[in-house]
């Protein structure tokens, strides 16, 4: 009787996962929201194969390219891989929980809790690098845990493959090795663990060598860009940034999940003994990124991989001791899921939703202007704007250029499609610029200037023409 009852309960949990999937698919399919700048940039990268791109490793572009080559370039298809990646991650987390000898019901709850992360409800509607990083991070932890349970060269190789795929998604995969070093401190058989980590490291190095060669051949442009993101040349030691980052972390998963994780530190010795693996692959990352937020700044998602370990601990504690709070956490996650899906289908006129509308009309305006003026080039000074026009105005792609001043390229488009002031002298030019006029030369030669008003004032841009 107990077995049948447990089986019935698990079936309901599977049904809940299916319902979450259906809500997400319906919301994404019927959403009127358009492509934002980063998404358009990733799409443009996907139009040609390379081992790397200006600001990111290549995996997100490869995945977009695979989907769009089969199913077309619709916004739904462009964003769909993120949604699917999150559901694959939930499946991996189910198996990771089972690798810790936790029962089927708890493992299903781990999957559901991940799917109901506040950040996942948003991220499922945006094509970005994070869903794929989380998928391969979780897969790496799964096979590494299996390897620790039962030593096998097959599991070492599988771990290495998933770590390498994680690197191809995002450089934050480096935290795997940082956390593995911390795990050594908690392990009795240190020699064996160090040997396995070194084997994984060298296999990963071989697997990502094509990308490393690409980085070298482009004068380390991606590494330089990644280093610039740390912003250590700006004003240092910011309490405001620190507080903003800490607050943001309570909304990656849910406030309850992070609170339960933090609460366990009151039982330090027992906590470490029970959860050494999960702690090693979460706490060092949170500490490191929190320190970075104080030194300069840190985006909320920089610590996203830490929340796999955080959530594994919190779910185990909630499942064993706090069933009512667990139910409250699930209800909260479902409420946010429904709210986000409602806003995705019927977006309110507030940020960020109104920033993702208006490009189709803007494209028609620019196309009409270009054909009326018979311009030589359509020039941009903002990567977000040029990326969106590359997506929405493919017939004019050869005319689209990025205004360069000859310094180190500041983005992918300045690197691949630059145009200088000298190049546009005596040419008919449409300038689409984000702020005021981008140079004195343009001020002196300007014939027409008007602001194109998008639904959100922050999304406005200026259209200028000169010859």
What does each of the following model-derived ranges do?
Residues 80-101, 116, 139-143:
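Transmembrane-helix motifs of polytopic, lipid-linked glycan transferases
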Residues 319-346:
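Signature aromatic-anchored transmembrane alpha helix within multi-pass, membrane-resident enzymes
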Residues 119-133:
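Short acidic/glycine- and proline-prone juxtamembrane loop motifs at membrane-interface regions
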